[in-house]
């Protein structure tokens, strides 16, 4: 049986990368998209439509992804064994003292709430399977750097979600991991532009290798994978997210 990866946020820079990586491993993709226009965009950016099934859902809604899982259970969509959550993207640069409640909520809603909804909707389905499954969430180093307070706070919350998920799945069939990214990634058609090149942007098709490598390494479980430089894409570095206590 050919396995399937559910990609949430499939038309974003990281989502497209996950789609490409999954297809390279000879797996199929179930891509969650916003609307019909996003379907055409995904096929263009991924460079193919082969092996990709799309489903429209509002991932910002509390029940949007649950409706997708329900369709899978009812046989209306392909079964999936892997989840890649790549939702987010709000990047307000407003200083903390000037951040409005509206902007704060927008950052938390898009960058954190959607990831929580994704985990809650899919984890039970992964746990119900008899074979090994995986759940991967992408986070950004901005939560530690802190230069953009709105996004930074949302990433801090997402780090904690990952710690709780690691603890809950430590002795289960689900291989939960956090992929921690510290440099910009863009879809190929954007990454090759002169301004992006000056910023050191990495192409989504290159970053895709990080997911290929993670899927192949069964020993990486309950960990944070550090992607600090492009060199880390092919030589994954990771450490357990388990609580280690105070520093010695």
UniProtKB/Swiss-Prot annotation:
Enzyme class per UniProt: oxidoreductase
EC nos: 1.1.1.-
UniProt note: phenotype after gene disruption: Reduced strongly the production of iso-A82775C and accumulates pestalodiol F.
Pathway membership, UniProt: Secondary metabolite biosynthesis
Induction, as annotated: Expression is co-regulated with the other genes from the iso-A82775C biosynthesis cluster and probably controlled by the cluster-specific transcription factors iacI and iacK.
Keyword field contains Transport: no
Superkingdom of the organism of origin: Eukaryota
Gene (UniProt): iacG
SUPFAM superfamilies: NAD(P)-binding Rossmann-fold domains
InterPro entries named in the record: NAD(P)-bd_dom_sf (IPR036291), SDR_fam (IPR002347)
Alphabetical list of Pfam families matching this protein: adh_short
Molecular functions per Gene Ontology: oxidoreductase activity
Role summary: Short-chain dehydrogenase/reductase; part of the gene cluster that mediates the biosynthesis of iso-A82775C, a enylepoxycyclohexane and biosynthetic precursor of the chloropestolide anticancer natural products. Within the cluster, the prenyltransferase iacE prenylates siccayne to generate pestalodiol E, using dimethylallyl diphosphate (DMAPP) as cosubstrate. The probable oxidoreductase iacF is then involved in the epoxidation of pestalodiol F to pestalodiol F, which is further converted to pestalofone A by the short-chain dehydrogenase/reductase iacG.
Binding site for NADP(+): 14, 35, 41, 58, 120, 187
Name the record gives this protein: Short-chain dehydrogenase/reductase iacG
Uses in biotechnology: Iso-A82775C is a precursor for the biosynthesis of the anticancer natural products chloropestolides A to E via a Diesls-Alder reaction with maldoxin. In the absence of the prenyltransferase iacE, siccayne accumulates instead of iso-A82775C and can also be condensed with maldoxin to produce chloropestolides H to K, which show also antibacterial and anticancer properties.
């Amino acid at each position: 049986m050919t396995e399937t990866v559910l990609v949430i946020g499939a038309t974003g820079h990281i989502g497209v990368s996950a789609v490409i990586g999954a297809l390279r491993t000879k797996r199929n993709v179930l891509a969650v998209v916003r609307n019909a226009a996003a379907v055409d965009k995904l096929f263009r950016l991924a460079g193919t439509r082969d092996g990709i099934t799309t489903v429209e859902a509002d991932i910002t809604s509390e029940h949007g992804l649950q409706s997708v899982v329900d369709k899978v259970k009812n046989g209306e969509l392909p079964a999936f064994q892997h989840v890649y959550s790549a939702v987010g993207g709000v990047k307000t640069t407003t200083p903390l003292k000037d951040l409005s409640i509206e902007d704060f909520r927008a950052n938390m809603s898009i960058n954190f709430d959607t990831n929580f909804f994704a985990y809650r909707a899919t984890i039970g389905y992964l746990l119900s399977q008899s074979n090994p499954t995986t759940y991967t969430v992408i986070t950004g180093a901005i939560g530690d750097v802190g230069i953009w307070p709105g996004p930074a706070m949302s990433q801090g919350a997402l780090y904690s979600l990952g710690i709780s998920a690691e603890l809950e799945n430590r002795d289960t069939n689900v291989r939960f991991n956090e992929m921690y990214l510290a440099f910009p990634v863009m879809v190929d058609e954007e990454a090759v532009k002169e301004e992006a090149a000056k910023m050191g942007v990495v192409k989504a098709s290159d970053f895709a290798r990080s997911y290929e490598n993670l899927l192949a390494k069964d020993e990486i479980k309950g960990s944070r994978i550090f992607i600090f430089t492009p060199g880390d894409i092919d030589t994954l570095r990771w450490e357990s997210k388990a609580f280690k206590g105070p520093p010695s």
